[in-house]
Amino acid sequence: MEIWLLKRMEPVYAHYPWKLLLKSGTKGVATSNYGRNLMKEMMLVYDGDQHRYAQIAGHGFRILAEAMEKDLPYEIKCPSLLICGIKDHAGSCIRYNREWHRKTKIPLKWIEGAGHNSNTDKPEMINSLIEEFLSNI
């Protein structure tokens, strides 16, 4: 059902009232005012052209669904780190990250108080994790 829905998000975004989409889009990806304002600025580029925004978002959802459908074996052969905000409510990212970590044993760092765009909610923490990760390579 999830893949089926992902493939059909473009018309949903095209017909969803723009002001509500703007509100849910900004609140859905970040917990900080800074992160929400960045998302709002990005979305406002498409103010007056919701159709284009829906096309771009729909394309992203479709390619994600197609990749999930193919379920290709792919081994990451370089040092890797998964980072996910505890309050990430964008789709099923929390579930995906848990499963990815479980299957691959790639380290997974949970960011308290952060949403989908955790780097905008907790930039110091993210930068610290990346610096630590890079120093151990």
What are these regions (language model features)?
Residues 14-75:
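Conserved alpha/beta-hydrolase catalytic His-Asp/Glu region
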Residues 77-114, 120:
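Conserved loop-alpha-helix segment in the C-terminal half of the alpha/beta-hydrolase fold
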Residues 120-132:
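Post-His helix in hydrolase/transferase enzymes
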